[in-house]
Amino acid sequence: MSNGPPSPLESLEKTLPQASYLDAGEFQREYAAIFESGWVCVGRSDTLTEPGDYLAIRLRDQSLLVVRAENGELGAFYNVCRHRGTELVPLKDPGPVSGQFSRSIVCPYHAWSYHLDGRLRGTPHLAIDADGVSLHTMPLAEWGGFVFVCLAASHDEPLAETLGDGTARLKRYPLADLRVGQTITYEVEANWKVIVENYNECYHCGPIHPELCQIVPAFKQGGGDGLDWDDGVPHREGANTFTASGTTTRAPFPGLSETEKTHHKGELFYPNLMLSLSMDHVAAFYLWPQSAGHTRIQCDFLFHPDELSKTDFDGSDAIEFWDLVNQQDWNICESVQRGMRNKVFEHGYYAPMEDYSLDIRRYVRGRLAEADR
């Protein structure tokens, strides 16, 4: 090692070490401590409106179902028949996939059936007392129309405690009333933390998002330093939303403050929900890590039902603009992931204007420490 003077970079905060982004063993440890030990977001309840509507998704090797029961309640179950372990909804792909059961959930293997609330209904040619037998359940909770499940064997932390103060900052947005207008799924060859770190700072916005910075010049001023995410970031004069023109014919959400009608807000809810909020639409990102170097991202574009019900509704101005911005983000995140494989890379650094990205370092270390207790 060199005995020379310390590098000027040593005055900066360090990222997590290289292995945290690349190593398969570290990924497994981290995934168990975070994604299998607390609340994770799996989608929107407004996509499950009728009895029998379901969402099936595989989170790594854990397969689950979210089902709307006859009484209107949502339930979450492991996607596995009590008989021989068959998937009730086959998932060769991680999903999510959606569909509708008719009167019951029927296993495709031997036709064991279950009520929509998970209770065993029938076992062909077997006289089994169904009372007290049901699909394996898991905790489910909702906030703002978002559905969260928990894979932990025992978990007593309320969802509100996990979500933290961000919910109060978004209290005027009618999130529970919004509906999914369109969904785009991305396969990103980058560690999920690289994506979260990118979301948490705008130091990159000037070089990476020139079109976005035309709408929100504050994103590139001073490297994105001093942005007020609590109250939102102002658009340029005459602009009020994330579209190529910065304008739209869609009305602002009811209930917003005057500031929120002209400012953009962003909120991260660990570990896997990122929200970007304009006055007329919301881009909701769900991150589902597949491996140390691969993350599946679903982006739901949410609009007010009053707008969606119009015969001439067209959300493409927002969706196409967001798709451009997203592709720019995912491309640079993949470049980061490739670059970190170089043997000279030990860790990165956070510039002062990237202080929000420090959250991921604190969060991951905290969750790993909890798991090791």
Residue ranges with predicted function:
Residues 42, 88, 120, 212, ...:
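Short clusters of hydrophobic/aromatic residues that line enzyme substrate/ligand-binding pockets
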Residues 1-20, 176:
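Short, contiguous pre-domain boundary segments
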Residues 37-49, 120-125, 266-271:
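Short Pro/Gly-enriched beta-strand edge/turn motifs at strand-loop
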Residues 30, 80-81, 106, 195, ...:
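Short hydrophobic core segments
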Residues 146-148, 152-373:
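C-terminal catalytic domain of Rieske-type non-heme iron oxygenases
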Residues 47-153, 157-164:
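Rieske [2Fe-2S] iron-sulfur-binding domain
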Residues 35-39, 86, 204:
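Generic structural signal for secondary-structure transition and capping sites
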Residues 20-59:
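Non-catalytic accessory segments flanking enzyme active sites
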